[in-house]
């Protein structure tokens, strides 16, 4: 019988590049909580997905020579994309939402219109500082040393017509929500939100943009696209069927029991999100949990900074479950932690190979060696058994107390205390000595049974963290599915007295630290070398007189059009300063849209002989540079006049 519903979400990730270990950390943590709740008997809905609109993606797609939709399709659905990564990491999400999904687009348009009709969204004009990578507007007072307070990068002045959400209207209700003591965790985040955002005064929020087009159109004002706050945040509801016909379980699962988010987006989820839900008259989520960052060399990992760790490489080298375990054992969820390969390998060797792996392999091997794989039913109890039995029997209650409060690290510590005690129990009872005395047969069987029962309980509680390895361990100790339930994790003596074990593979082989670190460094160096730009060979020297024969001048693009029947050529009409328009054809159609080049300032060689291309005359050549197979036009500051000669 279900204990009720439990709806948990990750943030939806921004697919401007491949996802990294930081995204994996959040998703694995959310998956462990979801699996734990399923194990406990809850009806779980686990949602993840991708936030696919915005200026940054539009610009990255343009640089890649593809449409924004093609760009995000590759990052999300392509080889090594988000979906493939979550499949590799054994993520058990029930749904995956993309903000480009039709049902979400239609629902967001309806949501925007409802808030507009209520008067909580109004039209105005925005002027302020904007960070393109974060897609965030900031006031001067919020900047840190003149830079974005979230990512530390440069901001630029932006001014445009926009729609605004009356965030200021909801300042006091949001303050009360934050001070309730249950909505936002860890508690340190509450003080941060109130001190940094509520107390200085909430300003109304820009919720539409006109400076880019890659977004959900405001259907009653098509020049505007819905900005990320409305588009991305409402995914948690649209994915359940809110204002759309795709799903029909909004009433069953909403409100969310917990939104798991990185601490950098706590502000959006604990201030903006509840304010918008209040505007819509919708129930508020029960909790927002802001986890810490995985740091690399003391700094935050970032796709734009390029200092990221590839989870695929780690999973393939060490195993998915070993990586999942490390991420949730090494770092408390609410705090930052430094990622390192040394810590990962050490944790695998110490906890998984030495403690858990050793206990499993030794126990199974002794049952096979001393009893042919099946324990006899006779038993002989000893006081040495009492502490281990008591620890294992009470473990579930302690474990649940931590898991219910997102204490994944401490829950794992408690499990491994019992595993360590079981290894000590082997040394105390010395089964190899008992095996030499036939009269100790019942005592030996009791010792081995106690070890198998301890494994059954501890491995059951490790299921949310290392699902595949736990299933393999159950097969080795002869535990049937009905013996590895949540209820039975609190009961001692569930395995049959005559349990049969099965020899299996070594789940967590030890790793040679020195050798492995050397191989990782070699891989890193090879990857860096492969990514280094390949320079074209240097051409033979020319004299200054030969060079001076090239008449290179600044030109203004008056008109740019595609050439019929050609997928490579664009036809430029240029002002070269002579008073007569000049026509030049250039093979850059794959890399630029014609309309975006009009008005640009480019450089051309003018004194080349006319050349016929697709039946049209080309009088000169535009200068460009090649990088990663893409041609980039050489463009100058617009203040340089047409006809200016390069010197």
Language-model features: where?
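Structured secondary-structure scaffolds
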Residues: 1-48, 103-107, 151, 157-369, ...
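N-terminal catalytic cores of NTP/NDP-binding nucleotidyl/phosphoryl-transfer enzymes
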Residues: 2-71, 97-112, 117, 134, ...
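A broadly conserved sequence feature marking short terminus-proximal activation segments
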Residues: 71-130
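Cys/His-rich short segments
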Residues: 118-171, 175
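Helix-rich, typically C-terminal accessory recognition domains appended to large enzymatic cores
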Residues: 123, 330, 335, 343-381, ...
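Hydrophobic, well-ordered secondary-structure elements that form the walls
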Residues: 298, 415, 451, 467-469, ...
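Intrinsic disorder at enzyme termini
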Residues: 473-546
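Phosphate-backbone binding interfaces of nucleic-acid-interacting proteins
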Residues: 528-647
């Amino acid at each position: 019988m279900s204990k009720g519903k439990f709806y948990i979400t990750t943030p939806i990730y921004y697919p401007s590049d491949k996802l990294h270990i930081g995204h994996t950390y959040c998703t694995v943590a959310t998956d462990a909580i979801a699996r734990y709740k399923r194990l406990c008997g809850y009806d779980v809905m686990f949602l993840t997905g991708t936030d696919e609109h915005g200026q940054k993606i539009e610009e990255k797609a343009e640089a890649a020579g593809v449409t924004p939709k093609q760009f995000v399709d590759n990052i999300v659905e392509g080889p090594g994309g988000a979906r493939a990564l979550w499949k590799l990491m054994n993520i058990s999400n029930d749904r995956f939402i993309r903000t480009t999904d039709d049902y979400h687009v239609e629902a967001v348009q309806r949501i925007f219109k409802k808030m507009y009709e209520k008067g909580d969204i109004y039209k105005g004009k925005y002027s302020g500082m904007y960070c393109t990578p974060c897609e965030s507007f900031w006031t001067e007072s919020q900047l840190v040393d003149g830079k974005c307070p979230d990512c530390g990068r440069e901001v630029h002045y932006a001014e445009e017509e926009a729609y605004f959400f009356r965030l200021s209207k909801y300042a006091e209700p949001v303050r009360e929500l934050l001070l309730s003591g249950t909505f936002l965790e860890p508690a340190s985040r509450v003080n941060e939100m109130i001190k940094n955002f509520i107390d200085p005064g909430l300003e109304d929020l820009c919720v539409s943009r006109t400076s880019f087009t890659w977004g959900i159109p405001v259907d009653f004002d098509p020049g505007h696209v819905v900005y990320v706050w409305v588009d991305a945040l409402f995914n948690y509801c649209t994915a359940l069927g809110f204002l759309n016909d795709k799903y029909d379980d909004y009433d069953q699962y909403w409100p969310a029991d917990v939104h798991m988010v990185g601490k950098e987006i706590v502000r959006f989820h604990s201030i903006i999100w509840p304010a918008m839900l209040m505007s819509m008259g919708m129930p508020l989520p029960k909790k927002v949990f802001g986890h810490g960052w995985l740091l690399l060399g003391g700094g935050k990992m970032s796709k734009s900074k390029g200092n990221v760790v590839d989870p695929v490489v780690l999973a393939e080298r060490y195993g998915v479950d070993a990586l999942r375990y490390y991420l949730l054992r090494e770092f408390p969820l609410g705090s930052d932690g430094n990622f390192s390969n040394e810590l990962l390998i050490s944790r695998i060797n110490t906890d998984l190979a030495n403690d858990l792996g050793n206990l499993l392999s030794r126990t199974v091997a002794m049952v096979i060696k001393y009893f042919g794989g099946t324990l006899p039913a006779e038993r002989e109890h000893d006081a040495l058994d009492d502490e281990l039995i008591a620890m294992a029997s009470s473990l579930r209650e302690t474990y649940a107390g931590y898991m219910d409060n997102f204490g994944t690290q401490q829950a794992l510590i408690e499990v491994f205390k019992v595993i360590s005690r079981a290894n000590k129990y082997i040394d105390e009872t010395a089964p190899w000595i008992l095996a030499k005395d036939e009269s100790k047969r019942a005592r030996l069987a009791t010792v081995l049974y106690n070890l198998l029962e301890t494994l059954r309980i501890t491995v059951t509680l490790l299921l949310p963290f290392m699902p595949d390895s736990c299933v393999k361990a159950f097969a080795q100790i002869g535990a049937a599915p009905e013996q590895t339930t949540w209820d039975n994790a609190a009961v001692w003596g569930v395995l049959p007295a005559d349990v049969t074990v099965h020899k299996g593979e070594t789940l967590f082989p030890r790793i040679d630290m020195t050798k492995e670190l050397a191989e990782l460094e070699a891989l890193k160096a090879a990857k860096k070398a492969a990514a280094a730009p390949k320079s074209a060979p240097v051409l033979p020297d020319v004299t200054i007189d030969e060079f001076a024969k090239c008449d290179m001048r600044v030109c203004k693009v008056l008109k740019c059009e595609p050439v019929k029947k050609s997928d490579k050529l664009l036809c430029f009409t240029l002002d070269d300063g002579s008073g007569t328009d000049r026509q030049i054809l250039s093979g850059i159609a794959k890399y630029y849209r014609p309309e975006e080049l009009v008005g640009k300032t480019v450089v051309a060689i003018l004194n080349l002989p006319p050349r016929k291309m697709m039946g049209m005359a080309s009088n000169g050549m535009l200068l460009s540079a090649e990088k990663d197979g893409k041609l980039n036009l050489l463009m100058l500051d617009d203040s340089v006049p047409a006809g200016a000669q390069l010197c």
